[in-house]
From Swiss-Prot:
Bias kind Acidic residues: ranges: 17-35
Gene Ontology, cellular component aspect: axon; cytoplasm
Name of the protein this chain belongs to: F-box/WD repeat-containing protein sel-10
Pfam families: F-box-like (PF12937), WD40 (PF00400)
Organism: Caenorhabditis briggsae
Keyword annotations: Cell projection, Cytoplasm, Repeat, Ubl conjugation pathway, WD repeat
Superkingdom of origin: Eukaryota
Length: 589
């Protein structure tokens, strides 16, 4: 059911870093596999042929020692006669003969029989196989099993350290992890206690450094033996940090005074926040300091985006303009004019921007040149949400419809009709031509617009009792958060609700899916909760405001694989406007 190719770890088991076995081979030796030559090399010129690996295993040695006591003597005619008779027996008769022999033997003979028989059930199959086949087998194991494999023998340990084995796990679980950051400067300094805000405990960095040094002296540098293994084990440590461990650090970013943070994005080391105070702020995540304040709008900023290349920041405002800023220094490059009402939403692919407005239109722009490309007209009311993949534009409006557009011709390809109230949220997955739309009519509709016109609806998901504020889709699993205070987990092909996650006391404002079954949600109740959507259970509260329930709320969430940004404030001045950063990162083992 679950759209996952990753490896599930038993939460109750020992962690992989704790299970790292004491190496049975030279610590300085690095083993690589050349599959064409079927041999190992240790980086120093020496090589280990695969045939040699498989010919001297401990189990093979045991088999040799367990041979018959008479194997070096001349053949015994009486024994040879019995063996010949035995071969002529049927299988059933042979089994009966075995049983009678055991019954007629004394305990000493039975012990010798056992020593001869047992090795046949303990064959070292990895040593008997070509190296590339052994690697293929190990690529199907999880990290805990690979740790156990490494403790069996030198041969098995060498195979378990091969880069390809851990690269396979890394691809299934933790891809594209950025290198660890040393977040100890600026706003990250001495922020373990945040007045009025409850967050997870922080690690004792001194204890961490001592623990790492002890492991390094005992086991040697894992990264040097297998970079992919080190990266994967770091990924598992990060996941455990999210689940239950103390966090690496926290930072408070104060800005926008008592105004609402309306939008927030992360790109590498940049965090961008937009506010109804007419400004945007560009923050450095590494030190938690403001790099630039973007002034220029004459109305509140309601939507913003960072370009995929990271060079541009784009913002839309109630002043009816779109502005393009240079991220490096905050310089205003272009002011895009044309909309006649609030710019409410935007989506970007490369340097092509699509904006949606309360003037019922969408506009396509080139942000490098600042030129207007075309206008998409067809909605009969305000455009509330938009998605864009570079070719296809999907928009949702207050006219209860979802429209599919060709971005370059400007033609409306399809109008999806079915909602009975305003469309507030959209998801678009271009590979499958799937659109998910959430409406004030409380329903979520899943469409496949590659189907014939009129047959696009593939699922009608009912159960929420208010508007859907956020959705994320992976495979057949859709997660939605709603103003009714509940999170629901759906199977879009079955059209069923798998889990209802209850715990928030007020409207849910934002949702972030980290993969591997972890979802974080924020709420007007002043909390951020982490859920396991596979089991349908609450893992823990990541943030809890003392002012929650009295006006303090979490407006927005934004995340990377190692960090969570929470936009915090209130509508009645009970909570200071700020962004809290929580660092769940881990160093290489």
């Amino acid at each position: 059911m679950w759209p996952r190719n990753d490896v599930q770890m038993d939460e109750g088991s020992m962690t992989p870093e704790d299970q790292e076995p004491e190496p049975a081979i030279d610590q300085d030796m690095e083993f690589d596999v050349n599959l064409e030559e079927n041999s190992y090399s240790n980086g120093s010129g020496s090589s280990y042929n695969a045939d040699k690996l498989s010919s001297s295993s401990p189990l093979q040695h045991k088999l040799d020692l367990s041979a018959s006591p008479t194997q070096n003597n001349e053949a015994n005619p009486r024994v040879e006669h019995l063996v010949a008779l035995f071969k002529d027996l049927t299988v059933a008769e042979q089994m009966e003969a075995f049983a009678r022999l055991v019954q007629e033997s004394n305990m000493s003979n039975i012990r010798q029989m056992r020593a001869i028989i047992e090795p046949h059930f303990q064959k070292d199959f990895l040593s008997c196989l070509p190296v590339e086949i052994g690697i293929k087998i190990l690529q199907n194991l999880n990290s805990t099993d690979l740790m156990k494999v490494a403790q069996v023998s030198k041969n098995w340990k060498m195979l378990s350290e091969v880069e390809k084995v851990w690269k396979s796990l890394e691809d299934r679980g933790f891809k594209n992890l950025l290198e660890p950051s040393d977040r100890t400067r600026g706003a990250w300094e001495a922020t373990a206690v945040i007045p009025g805000v409850n967050i997870p405990d922080h690690v004792n960095q001194c204890e961490i450094n001592i623990h790492r040094l002890v492991k390094l002296l005992k086991y040697g540098p894992i990264y040097e033996r297998s970079a992919d293994k080190s990266r994967y084990l770091r990924g598992e440590k990060i996941e455990k940090n999210w689940h239950s461990r103390p966090i690496m650090g926290s930072a408070i970013l104060r800005g926008h005074e008592e105004h609402v943070i309306t939008c927030m994005q992360i790109h590498n080391d940049l965090l961008v926040t937009g506010s109804d105070d007419n400004t945007l702020k560009v923050w450095s995540i590494d030190d938690g300091e403001v790099k630039h304040t973007l002034n220029g709008h004459s109305g509140g900023v309601w939507t913003s985006q960072i370009s995929q290349c990271g060079r541009y920041i784009v913002s839309g405002s109630t002043d009816r303009t779109v502005k393009v800023w240079r991220a490096e220094d905050g310089f205003l490059l272009h002011t895009l004019q044309g909309h006649t009402s609030t710019v409410r939403c935007m989506a970007m692919a490369n340097t092509t921007l699509v904006t949606g407005s309360r003037d019922c239109t969408l506009r396509v722009w080139d942000i490098e040149t600042g030129l207007h490309v075309r206008t998409l007209q067809g909605h009969q009311a305000a455009v509330r949400c938009v998605q864009f993949d570079g070719n296809i534009v999907v928009s949702g409006g207050y006219d209860f419809t979802v429209k599919i557009w060709d971005a370059f011709s400007g033609k409306c390809l399809r109008t999806l009709i079915g909602h009975s109230n305003r469309v507030y949220s959209l998801l678009y997955e271009s590979e499958r031509s799937i659109v998910c739309s959430g409406s004030l009519d409380t329903s979520i509709r899943v469409w496949d617009f590659s189907r014939p016109e009129g047959q696009e609806l593939i699922a009608f998901l009912s159960g929420h009792t208010s508007l859907t504020s956020g959705m994320q889709l992976r495979g057949n699993i859709l997660v939605s958060c709603n103003a009714d205070s509940h999170v629901r987990v759906w199977d879009i092909y079955e059209g069923t609700c798998i889990h209802i996650l209850s715990g928030h006391r007020s409207a849910i404002t934002s949702l972030q899916w980290f993969g591997r079954g972890l979802v974080a949600t924020s709420s007007d109740d002043g909390s951020v909760k982490l859920w396991d959507i596979e089991r349908g259970v609450l893992i823990r509260d990541l943030v809890s405001l003392n002012s929650g329930g009295n006006g303090g709320c979490i407006w927005r969430l934004c995340s990377t694989q190692t960090m969570l940004a929470c936009a915090i404030g209130s509508r009645n001045n009970t909570e200071e406007t700020k962004v809290i950063l929580l660092d769940f990162d881990a160093n290489h083992p």
